[in-house]
């Protein structure tokens, strides 16, 4: 039995919702985890990605130590384009390669007042969850280290 009966687990319905999702919902889907340093600093695990964030690819063909700036967030295709992640086309021109945000970690955030508010709000709700005992003891110890 499913835990929440009002949410469907039908594959075709979920695919339909994914591909027909409006832009404001796609924004949330296009979230990336924060690096360990940022996670310690802000007490937030992930954030919706935006242009001018600095990211590092951690999965796939382009993974490596190089850190690049997000050039474009293409919500329609569910991909982001990163500064140094390019390939050459047959005619010789270089194009950016689309990468899904779940395959990168954010190493530097572009902060403005709205984004700072989001970080504070997320950290606050995480703190409330910790007080309720939502996270295991090991997780709490790791977060404090």
Swiss-Prot record:
**Residues with PTM Phosphothreonine:** 139
Q: Where is this region: Disordered?
A: 1-21, 118-145
Q: Name one GO biological process term.
A: translation
Q: Which GO terms of the molecular function aspect are on file?
A: RNA binding; structural constituent of ribosome
Q: Which InterPro entries does the protein's record reference?
A: KOW, Rib_uL2_dom2, Ribosomal_uL24_CS, Ribosomal_uL24_euk/arc, Ribosomal_uL24_KOW, Translation_prot_SH3-like_sf
**Pfam families found in the cross-reference section:** KOW, Ribosomal_L26
Superkingdom, natural source? Eukaryota
Q: Where would you find this protein in the cell?
A: Cytoplasm
Report the PTM annotation.
Ufmylated by UFL1 in response to endoplasmic reticulum stress, promoting reticulophagy of endoplasmic reticulum sheets.
**Protein name listed in UniProt:** Large ribosomal subunit protein uL24
Q: What is the originating organism of this protein?
A: Ailuropoda melanoleuca (Giant panda)
